[in-house]
């Protein structure tokens, strides 16, 4: 395959199209396939030869693909992106003409995946040279993917087996990757609605569903919807294939903070297994109610947490740490009328600096408001009066 002639290559593409062999045709259009390294196929002007053997718009699609292999061989990623855009546009013309059939879905998966990758590469290349607007290439790629998505989503005539709707989730996952990269998470909302209302949502491949739930979970986390976030990320982690350790680790980076905010602390073994010991001190600090240790852990691993986009989420653990510390005070004093001074002493003992009784009241008021403590502050008596039943409700029970 790596040394076939242009004629042989075009003949194979033609046969795949004529026999409706979407999977083989997808390989012939994919940059994961070895044919792209064949110098005989890396051509700057293959149009004439393609027109001789292939019908429009396939001739245009294949010619653009071969021009793309030429651009990649010259490390011209901006040109490769432009060629791949033509590949997707030409494919879409053919795809729309396929009424009530979906054999070409594998081709769509291959060409749209490569489009996103080339847009990413082109973007990085331009940024290194200080050219172009940040996110511009990826946004344009997203527009092309949305055109494909609309064709899939609007296919209401075909029977379920021949429906183009089977392509929706793959495209949504590619769009999620772009929207997260360019920080436009609000654009995910209509796509999530489209899947929520789809009767195929539980029928897509498990790999696609794992990816989808991962991004939906991350979005819910950023929206502070921690219970739906836990649900989605837990689904992804549980159903992610056990051989995909790297992906499982990636899911855990977001699942761990969510679980911790809901009161579930990870074990040392889990952190060790997935090389996430950055969370070890954070976990210990929250469990012990140790603000000093928590701040030190956040500072120590700040670069890692910021790079993962979870630093601000982890900062929310401070209020949980206060709750756990104050719960210890409650257990020590064994009364439902707790002097505010006792909380002040507990903070001072954990080396929290510059704290006074007013700040203690402020922290307690926040904890009561958030439902972490059932009770009220008696300003007259300078006491926290807590409920006799379950004054510190489980974090997982708080909406």
Swiss-Prot record:
InterPro entries associated with the record: Csn12-like (IPR045114), PCI_dom (IPR000717), WH-like_DNA-bd_sf (IPR036388)
SMART domains in the record: PAM
GO MF, any single term: double-stranded DNA binding
PROSITE patterns named among the record's database cross-references: PCI
Signal peptide (UniProt feature, chain positions): none
Source superkingdom: Eukaryota
A Gene Ontology BP annotation from the UniProt entry: post-transcriptional tethering of RNA polymerase II gene DNA at nuclear periphery
PCI domain boundaries: 210-391
Entry similarity comment: Belongs to the CSN12 family.
Name under which the protein is recorded: PCI domain-containing protein 2
Organism for this UniProt entry: Danio rerio (Zebrafish)
Lineage of producing organism: Eukaryota, Metazoa, Chordata, Craniata, Vertebrata
Primary gene name: pcid2
């Amino acid at each position: 395959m790596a040394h076939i002639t242009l004629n042989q290559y075009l003949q194979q593409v033609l046969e795949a199209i004529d026999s409706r062999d979407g999977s083989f045709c997808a390989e012939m259009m994919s940059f994961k396939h070895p044919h792209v390294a064949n110098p005989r196929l890396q051509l700057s002007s293959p149009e004439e030869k393609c027109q001789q053997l292939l019908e429009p718009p396939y001739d245009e699609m294949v010619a653009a693909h071969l021009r793309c292999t030429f651009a990649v061989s010259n490390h011209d990623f901006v040109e490769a992106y432009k060629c791949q855009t033509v590949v997707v546009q030409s494919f879409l013309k053919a795809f729309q003409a396929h009424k009530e059939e979906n054999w070409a879905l594998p081709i769509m998966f291959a060409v749209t995946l490569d489009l996103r990758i080339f847009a990413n590469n082109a973007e990085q290349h331009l940024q290194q040279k200080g050219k172009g607007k940040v996110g511009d290439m990826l946004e344009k790629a997203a527009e092309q993917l949305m055109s494909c998505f609309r064709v899939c989503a609007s296919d209401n005539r075909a029977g379920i087996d021949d429906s183009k709707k089977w392509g929706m989730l793959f495209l949504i996952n590619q769009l999620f990757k772009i929207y997260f990269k360019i920080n436009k998470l609000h654009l995910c909302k209509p796509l999530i609605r489209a899947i929520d209302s789809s009767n195929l949502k539980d029928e897509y491949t498990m790999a696609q569903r794992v990816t989808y739930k991962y991004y939906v979970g991350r979005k819910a986390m950023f929206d502070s919807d921690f219970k739906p976030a836990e649900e989605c990320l837990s689904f992804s982690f549980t159903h992610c294939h056990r051989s995909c350790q790297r992906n499982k680790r990636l899911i855990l980076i977001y699942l761990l903070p969510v679980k911790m905010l809901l009161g579930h602390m990870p074990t040392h073994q889990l952190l060790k297994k997935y090389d996430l010991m950055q969370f070890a001190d954070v976990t210990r600090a929250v469990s012990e109610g140790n603000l000093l240790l928590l701040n030190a852990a956040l500072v120590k691993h700040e670069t890692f947490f910021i790079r993962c986009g979870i630093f601000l989420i982890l900062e929310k653990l401070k209020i949980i740490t206060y709750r756990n510390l104050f719960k210890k005070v409650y257990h020590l004093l064994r009364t439902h009328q707790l002097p505010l001074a006792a909380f002040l002493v507990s903070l001072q003992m954990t080396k929290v600096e510059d704290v006074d009784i007013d700040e203690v009241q402020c922290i307690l008021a926040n904890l009561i408001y958030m439902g972490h403590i059932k009770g009220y502050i008696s300003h007259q008596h300078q006491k926290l009066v807590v409920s006799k039943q379950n004054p510190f409700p489980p974090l997982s029970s708080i909406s």
